[in-house]
Regions:
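GST-like fold's C-terminal all-alpha helical module
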Residues: 1-85
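Long, amphipathic alpha-helical stalk/connector segments used for oligomerization, subunit docking
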Residues: 530, 537-546, 564-608
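Core structural elements
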Residues: 556-559, 584-587, 610-625
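Basic, alpha-helical terminal appendages of large translation-related enzymes
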Residues: 90-169, 286-296, 307-326, 337, ...
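A charged helix-plus-loop insertion that forms the helical arch/lid used to bind
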Residues: 225-238
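A broadly conserved sequence feature marking short terminus-proximal activation segments
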Residues: 239, 243-319
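Short functional micro-motifs and their immediate structural scaffolds
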Residues: 301, 317, 327-330, 347-348
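Structured secondary-structure scaffolds
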Residues: 110, 119-213, 265-268, 321, ...
Length: 832
C-alpha cells in the first residue's frame, strides 16, 4: 500500500494502466456487473483483489467513475462487507471463500463452458454440492422457526384494475396474435404463455398488475380468409377470435382482459394519434411503387409477397421483412417476387401514401432508448436488433395501405386507404385496455407510475422498439413507453418448422386432443423456452422431461412427503427437532428460493424453473439418506428423527406448490389442496428476496395425498410423433425395405467409404432409438444418484440396491441399442 500511495516503482504505473483499462470497459456496458445482470465469480475475485486499493479513501479514484460505481455496487452487499471484515480480522482467504459460496453461480447455475443441447437448454453441469456456511445454516433455521407471519393475503383481483399510488404498478402485454392463424406451440411460448407466467408471478409478489392481450384482426390476410370461406371479414374475425380464446383458456392463460382490434375504440385512438403526428410535422407524403397482382386484381400486402431477399439471398423473404437476416424490406426490392395467393408474378404500380418520418424522430428515440435499455430488463436479442436498426439509419416508414379491411385513414386526401397493420396493431394494446376500462389513460398516459412489459418473439422487436415508440413520442401526449422488452428466439418442431398445411407440428387446437394435461404442456414449453437461442420441441425429450423431472423428481418427492405424514403420523404433521443436517437443507432450499425470485424478477423464466427442480432434488436426497420409513420402526430417537425428516419434507413440498404456481397452476393448486396449505404461505414465501418458513406446523392436518403425474409411455409418444409429423408426398413411392433376398438381386452399388450411421445399424439389430434415448437419461440420473449416496456415505444396503437398479437400466439400454447380451465364451484357463 505504501508503494502505491508513494507512487514509487513501476507497480503503481502497472496498476494505474489496469484500472484505466477496466474503467473504460465498464463505461461501455450498461450491465451492473462484469458478466451480466447478476453477480458472478468474476466480480467476487476481482473486487477481492482490488479491495485494498478501492476501499482506501485516501486514493484519488474520482477519475475512475465507472470502476468506482461497480465496486460500490458489489461492496454494498451485506455478505461482501461481512467477508471483508473477516479479511481485516486475519481470516484472509477463508473469509472471501465464505462470501463466494453465498453467491449465485454465473448465469444462474448454468455452466459457462457447457455446450447447449439440441433443444437450446443448457447442458447439465457436473459440479459438486454447493458449500453452505455455518452462518447461513443458523440464519435459515432462525427464519424457518418464525413461521407464517401476519403479512396480508394475496387478494383476489377486483376489476377494473387501476394504478395505485403506493403500489408497484405493472402493465403486461403480449404480442397480439393474428386472428386467422391458429397459434402453434412456438407462438404460444413466445408471447402469451411467457407473459402469463410473469403475470402470475407478479401477482404472487403483491404487485398491482394488469395483463392485456387480444387478436389483431385487420389486414389483407383476413380479407382473403373471408373470401376462401365465403364469409365477411367481420364474421371471420368473430369465428377465429373465439378459436383463440378457447385455446388460451385450455392453456390456462390468465388474461385480465382478452380483446380485439376491430372496435370503435381502436378507430378513435388510432386516428387521434394520427392527427397528433400530423399536427407536429411527423408525417410526410410520397408516391411509392407497389406490387399489384393482376390475377387477384389487388395491391398485395407485404405478407402476401414472397421472393429472394436482396440482402442475404434467402429464398422465402416476405414483402416487409426477411426472417433469416431480420432486415426490413420494401416489397418491390424482392428479387423474383411471387403472389402467395396465386403464385403469379405481380407488376409494379405507383400509389400516393403517408409516411411516419422516423429520421425526424431519431434523436428523441435514441434518448429514450438509452434510458429504457439501461434501466429496464431488455433481452439481449431485443437490444441487438434495435441497435442494428439505428446503426443502419432510420428511414421514413409507410403507414397507409390500399386495402378495405382496416382502420380508415381520416385524412380527406387518403380516404380510400386504411392504416398499415404495423402502425395500427400496436395501438391495439391501448384500445383493448380502453375496452376493459374507460380509465385506460391511467395506465397508458402515466409513465412515471407505470412499468410496461412487452412480450413477443424476436421478429416483432423492431415494431415495438422503434416504430411504435416513435408513433407515441411524436404524438407528444405523455404516453407510457415500454420499460422492459422481453423477446424470445424461435421454437422449432423436431428438426423442421411448424406447418399447418403440411400437418407438421402441434397447434393450439390440437394439444388438448393428445391426452396430455395442459400443465405438462406448459412445463415442457417453459423448460425449452428459447431464451438465448432457438430451441426445438421434441416428443422424445418431452417424454424424458415428464418421466424424469416431473414424475421421478418433483412428483416423487411431493408424494412421498405427503404419504409419510398419512401413513406414519395419522395425517398430522409431526413435531420437528432440527439437527445440523436439517439446517443445512433449509439453507440450501432458501438459497434456491432466493435465486428463483432474483431470476423471475428479471424475467429469466426458464432458469427460474430449474431452481424448483433443484429443490425437489435436494428433498429426494434428504429423504433417501435419512430413510424415515425405517426409522419410524426404531426407538424413540429414531421415531423422532423420522418425524423431523417428514415434517421438513412436507414443508418443502408446500414451498414448491407456491413456486410452481406461475408455471403449473393446476398442479400447484392440487398440491396445496392435498396439503391443506394455508393461503398465507403464498404472501410470506414471496416477501422480499424470498422467505422459507415452516408453514405447516406440528399438528397441522393434511388432506388426501395422491400421485400428481403419469408416465408418458414410449408407444404413446411414438404414435403422437407420427400423428404430428406430416405425410409423405403422394407422388413419392414408399421406400422399399432392404432384405437379404432383394439385396442379393439388386445391382451392385458403390462401396461406401464410411460406416453406416449408428442409428441405422441399431435399427437393423432390432433396436428402439427412442426408447434408448429415454433409457440413456435414466442411466445418467441413476448413476448420479449412486454417486451422491456414496459421497454421503449412505448405508451399504441402500447403495447396493441402487447399484442393482443401475445395472438393470444399463441392460435395458443395451437391448434398446440393439447390442447382444450373450455372455462372451469363457477363456480356457492356462492352469492345469
Amino acid at each position: 500500500m505504501a508503494v502505491v500511495q508513494g507512487k514509487s516503482s513501476d507497480v503503481f504505473n502497472i496498476l494505474q494502466a489496469s484500472l484505466n483499462y477496466l474503467d473504460q470497459g465498464l463505461s461501455k456496458q450498461s450491465l451492473p456487473y462484469l458478466t451480466g445482470e447478476a453477480i458472478s465469480v468474476a466480480d467476487v475475485v476481482l473486487s477481492a483483489a482490488l479491495y485494498p486499493f478501492l476501499s482506501d479513501s485516501s486514493l484519488a479514484l474520482g477519475e475512475y467513475k465507472s470502476l468506482k460505481a461497480w465496486f460500490d455496487h458489489v461492496a454494498a452487499r451485506h455478505s461482501f462487507q461481512s467477508a471483508a471484515q473477516k479479511v481485516l480480522q486475519g481470516k484472509g482467504l477463508q473469509g472471501m471463500k465464505s462470501y463466494m459460496q453465498r453467491q449465485p453461480l454465473p448465469q444462474s447455475s448454468v455452466c459457462r463452458d457447457s455446450q447447449p443441447t439440441n433443444n437450446g437448454t443448457p447442458a447439465e453441469c457436473d459440479e459438486g454440492e454447493r458449500m453452505v456456511s455455518e452462518e447461513e445454516m443458523e440464519a435459515a433455521a432462525l427464519t424457518w422457526c418464525k413461521g407464517l407471519n401476519s403479512s396480508p393475503l394475496v387478494k383476489e383481483r377486483q376489476h377494473p384494475i387501476l394504478p395505485q399510488e403506493d403500489k408497484k404498478n405493472i402493465l403486461v402485454t403480449s404480442a397480439l396474435p393474428y386472428v386467422n392463424n391458429v397459434p402453434h406451440l412456438g407462438n404460444i411460448i413466445g408471447c402469451v404463455l411467457s407473459a402469463d407466467v410473469f403475470s402470475r408471478y407478479g401477482r404472487l409478489r403483491g404487485w398491482n398488475l394488469l395483463y392485456v392481450c387480444g387478436t389483431d384482426e385487420y389486414g389483407t390476410a383476413t380479407e382473403n380468409k373471408a373470401r376462401e370461406e365465403g364469409l365477411t371479414p367481420q364474421q371471420i374475425c368473430d369465428k377465429y377470435h373465439a378459436v383463440h380464446a378457447s385455446i388460451y383458456k385450455w392453456f390456462q392463460i390468465d388474461f385480465d382482459f382478452f380483446g380485439r382490434t376491430t372496435t370503435e375504440k381502436q378507430t378513435e385512438i388510432a386516428q387521434d394519434i394520427f392527427w397528433r403526428l400530423n399536427k407536429h410535422g411527423f408525417l410526410v407524403e410520397d408516391t411509392v411503387e407497389q406490387l399489384r397482382c393482376e390475377s387477384c386484381q389487388r395491391f398485395l400486402a407485404d405478407r402476401f409477397v414472397e421472393g429472394i431477399c436482396p440482402f442475404c439471398n434467402y429464398a422465402e423473404a416476405r414483402g416487409d421483412q426477411c426472417d433469416k437476416c431480420g432486415r426490413l424490406i420494401n416489397a418491390v426490392e424482392l428479387r423474383e417476387p411471387q403472389c402467395k395467393v396465386c403464385r403469379q408474378t405481380p407488376n409494379i404500380r405507383s400509389s400516393k401514401h403517408l409516411f411516419l418520418d422516423l429520421p425526424k424522430l431519431e434523436t428523441q428515440l435514441e434518448q429514450w432508448l438509452d434510458k429504457s435499455t439501461s434501466t429496464g430488463d431488455w433481452t439481449a436479442n431485443a437490444k441487438q436488433i434495435t441497435r442494428s436498426w439505428l446503426r443502419d439509419g432510420l428511414k421514413p416508414r409507410c403507414i397507409t395501405r390500399d386495402l378495405h379491411w382496416g382502420t380508415p385513414v381520416p385524412h380527406p386526401d387518403f380516404k380510400e386507404k386504411v392504416f398499415y397493420v404495423w402502425f395500427d396493431a400496436p395501438i391495439g394494446y391501448l384500445s383493448i385496455t380502453a375496452n376493459y376500462t374507460d380509465q385506460w389513460q391511467k395506465w397508458w398516459k402515466n409513465p412515471h407510475q407505470v412499468e410496461l412489459y412487452n412480450f413477443m418473439a424476436k421478429d416483432n422487436v423492431p415494431f415495438h422498439s422503434v416504430v411504435f415508440p416513435c408513433s407515441l413520442l411524436g404524438a407528444q401526449d405523455n404516453y407510457t413507453l415500454v420499460n422492459h422488452l422481453v423477446a424470445t428466439e424461435y421454437l422449432n418442431y423436431e428438426d423442421t418448422k411448424f406447418s399447418k398445411s403440411r400437418g407438421v407440428g402441434v397447434f393450439g387446437d390440437m394439444a388438448k386432443d393428445t391426452g396430455i394435461p395442459s400443465d405438462v404442456w406448459r412445463f415442457y414449453l417453459l423448460y425449452v423456452r428459447p431464451e438465448g437461442q432457438d430451441s426445438a420441441f421434441s416428443w422424445a425429450d418431452m417424454a424424458l422431461k415428464n418421466n424424469s423431472e416431473l414424475l421421478n423428481n418433483l412428483g416423487n418427492f411431493i408424494n412421498r412427503a405427503g404419504m409419510f405424514v398419512t401413513r406414519f403420523f395419522e395425517g398430522c404433521v409431526p413435531a420437528m427437532e432440527l439437527l445440523q443436517e436439517d439446517k443445512k437443507l433449509l439453507a440450501m432450499v432458501s438459497w434456491e428460493l432466493q435465486q428463483y425470485i432474483q431470476l423471475m424478477d428479471k424475467v429469466r423464466i426458464r432458469d427460474g424453473l430449474k431452481h424448483i427442480l433443484n429443490i425437489s432434488r435436494h428433498g429426494n436426497q434428504y429423504i433417501q439418506v435419512n430413510e424415515p420409513w425405517k426409522k419410524i420402526k426404531g426407538g424413540e430417537t429414531d421415531r423422532q428423527r423420522a418425524g423431523t425428516v417428514t415434517g421438513v419434507s412436507v414443508n418443502i413440498a408446500c414451498l414448491l406448490s407456491v413456486m410452481l404456481s406461475p408455471y403449473m397452476p393446476t398442479v400447484s393448486q392440487t398440491i396445496r389442496d392435498q396439503l391443506n396449505a394455508p393461503q398465507s404461505c403464498i404472501s410470506t414465501m414471496f416477501q422480499g428476496t424470498g422467505t422459507f418458513v415452516c408453514s405447516l406446523s406440528a399438528g397441522h392436518r393434511i388432506g388426501t395425498v395422491s400421485p400428481l403425474f403419469q408416465k408418458l409411455e414410449v408407444d404413446q409418444i411414438e404414435a403422437l410423433k407420427k400423428r404430428f409429423g406430416g405425410q409423405q408426398p403422394e407422388d413419392e413411392p414408399p421406400k422399399k425395405k432392404m432384405t437379404a433376398q432383394n439385396a442379393a438381386s439388386s445391382p451392385p452399388a458403390a462401396v461406401p467409404t464410411t460406416a453406416a450411421p449408428a442409428a441405422e445399424v441399431a435399427t437393423a439389430n432390432g433396436a428402439d432409438p427412442e426408447k434408448a434415448k429415454l433409457l440413456t437419461q435414466a442411466v445418467t440420473e441413476q448413476g448420479d444418484k449412486v454417486r451422491t449416496l456414496k459421497g454421503q456415505k449412505a448405508e451399504k444396503a441402500v447403495i447396493t440396491a441402487e447399484v442393482a437398479k443401475l445395472l438393470d437400466l444399463k441392460k435395458q439400454l443395451a437391448v434398446a441399442e440393439g447390442k447382444s447380451l450373450e455372455p462372451a465364451a469363457p477363456q480356457k484357463s492356462k492352469k492345469k
